Regions:
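Hydrophobic core segments of alpha-helical transmembrane domains in multi-pass membrane proteins
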Residues: 52, 79-87
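Interfacial helix-loop-helix junctions of multi-pass membrane proteins
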Residues: 63-77
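Membrane-interfacial catalytic/cofactor-binding modules of polytopic membrane enzymes
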Residues: 1-61, 103-132
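A generic membrane alpha-helix/interface feature
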Residues: 41, 77-78
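Transmembrane alpha-helical segments of integral membrane proteins
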Residues: 87-101
Length: 132
């Protein structure tokens, strides 16, 4: 089942579809408790960015903070949160531009999805090096 989700995600025809397949359980929870409530009051783009940011922070970055604080260290820069915001912006942009990769081979689609993730995380890591 997990392998199937990963395979479907990386061969998805759009970046938005990638995230629908990536983690169905997180996707359901985030849609129900984050995206939909925000979407009722604000534009879709704000709901998408907010949902990706919440996922990055609460389901990824925040999990490391208690251990760092217990060790007397500062919490880490929220690299995943910022990377997910970049990914959200890519999802919004590719949807607005109607980017569709149906005609591409599955391996090419997988490479494009990996490139998007790599660029988002590279941008976030670079941002983490600035003295905030």
């Amino acid at each position: 089942m997990i392998g199937n989700s990963i395979s479907r995600a990386f061969t998805a025809p759009t970046l938005g579809a990638f995230w629908l397949y990536w983690n169905p359980v997180y996707g359901f929870i985030l849609a129900r408790f984050c995206y939909r409530p925000i979407r009722r009051r604000l534009p879709d783009s704000i709901a998408v960015v907010s949902t990706f940011a919440a996922s990055g922070f609460f389901l990824h970055d925040l999990l490391l903070w208690p251990a760092r604080l217990a060790a007397g260290k500062r919490p880490l820069f929220p690299v995943v949160t910022l990377a997910f915001v970049v990914v959200a912006l890519l999802v919004i942009a590719t949807d607005a531009l109607e980017v569709d990769m149906h005609a591409l081979r599955p391996a090419t689609r997988a490479a494009i999805h990996l490139l998007c993730l790599a660029l988002a995380f590279a941008a976030s890591i670079l941002a983490s090096r600035f003295p905030w």
